[in-house]
Amino acid sequence: MLTEIDHVAIAVNDLEGAITYYHDAFGAEVEHREVIEHDGVEEALLRVADSYVQLLHPIRDDSTVAKYLANKGEGLHHIGYRVDDCAAALERVKALGFRAIDDAPRPGSRGTTVAFLHPKDAFGTLIELVPE
């Protein structure tokens, strides 16, 4: 079901500062950058081997990332796991009685459809299912 780690997402107040940090400290380059209007965030993806560091910065005060930053401050927001079939993985988790944030896969970045699983059932970790 899980095939790889797609990304580790970090919520940041200063996207440009975070990009500069990862570039200067580790030589990481931005491979993809996108504003995801429906989530109220701007992302920058920096490749690390076969995965990404996803830097998330809110563009609206009502976004979940803005609320996260207000409540918890900057830091690890979620882990994205690659799956063969996002809809099937989501249905399996729900059939086992675990909570999901999304009822069905929804648009994500890079033209994908994704689904989030509730951190209360995942030992405090927000999980994103990302198709291969």
Kindly label every feature range from the protein language model:
Residues 44-47, 54, 81, 90-132:
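Vicinal oxygen chelate
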Residues 25, 30-48, 52, 118:
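N-terminal strand-loop-strand beta-hairpin
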Residues 4-6, 28-38, 59-77, 92, ...:
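A cross-kingdom feature marking solvent-exposed beta-strand/loop segments within repeated
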Residues 5, 12, 22, 46, ...:
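Short, structured motif recognition centered on aromatic/hydrophobic residues
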Residues 50-53, 60-62, 86:
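Short, charged/polar surface micro-motifs in flexible loops or helix N-caps
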Residues 16-29, 96:
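Amphipathic alpha-helical segments
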Residues 1-19, 74-83, 132:
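N-terminal beta-strand motif that seeds the catalytic metal site of vicinal oxygen chelate
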